[in-house]
């Protein structure tokens, strides 16, 4: 059993389920509060000792693990989601190399964490607005740009846009964690079986 691969798939599941919520809210105007809260909490847990601690528990990323399970078995129902995930994983490389942007994002996350503590909810609309604004002012200017498509009616609403951007920030945070755990795009070519086995273990 590879502990590092087990950790990697949890982080990758964090990416997947944050982006699934992006897709959901862009199409329907609604997200799943518990899943969004897991994503937002992960943004604030920058000093957590393990991926499980980042998300609260492995069970908290079960939706993302199921997405990975289906993807690896060619049973995915959303063709756009893998493309979004690839864009986020590529964007993470640009982000971590831009030290000024990293510093700005870290400062903004600290401020949003204090706000969340005062409001008593990491999923509060004001917190989502702060994190969404932070993403818009920083990471969104890097390439590749993550393009979100959906229902124009919802994409024209400020609250929806803020939540989407906050979720994209959470997806990038999980991508950073994935790299920290040794993740690489080469894994999808040369370690796919190990990834599948790690996902299966996590879902048991």
Swiss-Prot record:
Disulfide bonds: none annotated. One of its GO terms (cellular component) is cytoplasm. Keywords: Cell inner membrane, Cell membrane, Cytoplasm, Membrane. Coiled coil: none annotated. It is a peripheral membrane protein. It holds the Pfam family DUF489. Its main location: cytoplasm. The keyword Cell membrane applies. Belongs to the HflD family. This is High frequency lysogenization protein HflD homolog. It comes from Xanthomonas oryzae pv. oryzae (strain MAFF 311018). The gene is hflD.
């Amino acid at each position: 059993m590879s502990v590092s691969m087990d950790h990697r798939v949890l982080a990758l599941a964090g990416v997947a389920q944050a982006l699934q919520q992006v897709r959901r809210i862009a199409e329907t105007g609604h997200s799943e509060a518990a899943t969004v809260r897991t994503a937002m909490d992960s943004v604030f847990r920058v000093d957590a000792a393990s991926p499980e601690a980042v998300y609260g528990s492995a069970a908290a990323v079960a939706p993302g693990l199921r997405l990975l399970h289906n993807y690896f078995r060619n049973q995915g129902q959303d063709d756009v989601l893998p493309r979004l995930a690839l864009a986020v994983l590529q964007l993470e490389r640009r982000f971590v190399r831009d030290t000024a942007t990293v510093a700005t994002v870290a400062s903004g996350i600290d401020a949003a964490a204090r706000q969340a503590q005062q409001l008593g909810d990491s999923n509060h609309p004001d917190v989502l607005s702060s994190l969404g604004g932070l993403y818009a002012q920083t990471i969104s200017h890097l390439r590749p740009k993550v393009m979100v498509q959906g229902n124009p009616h919802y994409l024209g609403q400020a609250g929806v846009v803020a939540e989407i951007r906050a979720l994209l920030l959470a997806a990038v945070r999980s991508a950073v964690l994935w790299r920290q755990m040794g993740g690489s795009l080469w894994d999808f070519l040369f370690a796919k079986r190990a990834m599948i086995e790690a996902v299966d273990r996590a879902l048991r």
